[in-house]
Amino acid sequence: MKLISWNVNGIRACVQKGFLDFFHEADADIFCIQETKMQEGQLNLELEGYYQYWNYAVKKGYSGTAVFTKKEPLSVSYGIGIEEHDQEGRVITCEFEEFYFVTVYTPISQNGLARLDYRMKWEDDFRTYLKKLEETKPVIVTGDMNVAHKEIDLKNPKTNRKNAGFTDEERQKFTELLDAGFIDTFRYFYPEQTGIYSWWSYRFSARAKNAGWRIDYFCVSESLKDRLDDAKILTDIMGSDHCPVELDLK
């Protein structure tokens, strides 16, 4: 089973940069995207053989998520059931027979960490939401989580210690997610791998220099460990400031 997640940084722009070619070539069982930056009706994607589910932000041209799946879910829900968190189209949950599949676009803490306090509340509420799901069946959670967990997860850790995405507070919340019983699948397979990133700033020729961050993840419940086959970061796929990430299950 092949699962793919990609922050497309605007699906309408990404479609102009080869999104559909990659989508069809990948032939994933479940393909999810974050930061769609669109409202309902602004784009009609013809994806034969896939069910489509979209969650739009109230604010136009901002945030948003979508899931495309070959198999129809048993149920689909949008958001996490907390109004203050559910205005930005950040979460879609698809229930399948064997697991819940959750895609997330985690709120960024912003320049000057203006939104860090909100981010901390989000992290706790989202983790609680995942653990509640897990009481019923295992969970796969994937998307742009807007944090580089360890120093090996970004090119320049020392100069970014107090920047959004690499603060001690954000990193601690990711640790708490793992401590709550989730596996960072890429690190499960490649615990010491350096120089592999999923996001590069558009500034300073960052991608050409591979001055990146690994902030896109597939995390799974511990009970799914035996089904893990491989985790990949598809660094050669262009079209966004992020690249897709992949999880293969047995």
Where are these regions (language model features)?
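Active-site-proximal beta-strand elements of phosphoester/diester hydrolases
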Residues: 1-9, 98-110, 142
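Active-site beta-strand/loop signature of hydrolases that rely on acidic residues for catalysis
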Residues: 7, 23-41, 101, 130-151, ...
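Surface polyanion/phosphate-binding segment centered on an Asp-His-Pro turn
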Residues: 232-250
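Structured beta-strand-rich core segments of catalytic domains in phosphoester-bond hydrolases
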Residues: 37, 42-109
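Conserved beta strand-loop-helix elements of the APE1-like EEP
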Residues: 60-75, 196, 204-226
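Surface-exposed cleft-lining segments at the edges of enzyme active sites
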Residues: 81-82, 107-123, 158-162
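Metal-dependent phosphoesterases centered on the DNase I-like endonuclease/exonuclease/phosphatase
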Residues: 51, 125-211, 215
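N-terminal, active-site-proximal structural segment of metallo-dependent hydrolase catalytic domains
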Residues: 1-47, 57, 62, 177
